[in-house]
Structures are given as structure tokens and as C-alpha cells.
């Protein structure tokens, strides 16, 4: 599948009910899909998530009972588990701001207004609220 074909496919939404267990996602197509997950936007750009890709048949079988016994879990070639990150804190925000300054080629000081907005947002929430925010990002 070419990148253009992948984009066209992503624009067409469809819930697959039955997977062909004899087929797998080609490595170059999977690589493009992984890159699209990495590039997914989030609030503040913090991306408070982790993607876990499961291809092991035994692991997928073990997850079946936790997935309402939906056969798609065991029949798919690649299963992606989306995880919200718990415990977002000031260190994470500072790390993100340092990375942002580096990528944009600007000083960290030039991002102080943005930093203040982020700190105000997260400073007004407890851990439960921060986790709820992260879950909503996923």
C-alpha cells in the first residue's frame, strides 16, 4: 500500500467485524501507521499516552476475555492498546518545553507565556483530574 493509498483508506471510516487471519499488515504500511500514531496531535502537544502494539498470538488470546470475547482481538495481525499516562507533573511539562524550544530553535524564555498557561491549567487539577484529562486525549 502506498502512502497515498493509506491516506485514502484512513479517510474512509469502517469498523472491521471479521479479519482474514491469513493476512498481515505489511511492515512498510505498519511503519506508516505507527508514524501516524506518533504524530497524532494532543492538547498542549504533551501526548500523554503510550501505544502498545501486540502481535503475539498468545498475548492476544490472553486479552480475549478482557475484550468481551470479540474475535477481532485474536484475529487481527496487529493490535494497538492505547494507554493514558498517569502522573503528569512539572518535570514532564519542563521536558516538553525544552524539546519544543530546541525543535523550534527558540530560547526557553520565549515560551514562558505558554509555560505559564500550561502550569496554570495543570496547577488547577489534582491527580485524578489530570488522569481524566490524559484519558480524554487518548
Role assignments for model-derived ranges:
Residues 1-138:
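Acidic, surface-exposed loops and disordered segments
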Amino acid at each position: 500500500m502506498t502512502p497515498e493509498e493509506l491516506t485514502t483508506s484512513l479517510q474512509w471510516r469502517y469498523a472491521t467485524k471479521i479479519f482474514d487471519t491469513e493476512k498481515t499488515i505489511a511492515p512498510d504500511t505498519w511503519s506508516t501507521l505507527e508514524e501516524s500514531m506518533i504524530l497524532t496531535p494532543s492538547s498542549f502537544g504533551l501526548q500523554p499516552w503510550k501505544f502498545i502494539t501486540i502481535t503475539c498470538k498468545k498475548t492476544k488470546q490472553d486479552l480475549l476475555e478482557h475484550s468481551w470475547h470479540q474475535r477481532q482481538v485474536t484475529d487481527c495481525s496487529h493490535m494497538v492498546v492505547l494507554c493514558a499516562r498517569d502522573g503528569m507533573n512539572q518535570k514532564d511539562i519542563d521536558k516538553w518545553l525544552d524539546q519544543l524550544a530546541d525543535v523550534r530553535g527558540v530560547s526557553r524564555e520565549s515560551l514562558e507565556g505558554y509555560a505559564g498557561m500550561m502550569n496554570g491549567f495543570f496547577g488547577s487539577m489534582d491527580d485524578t483530574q489530570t488522569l481524566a484529562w490524559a484519558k480524554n486525549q487518548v
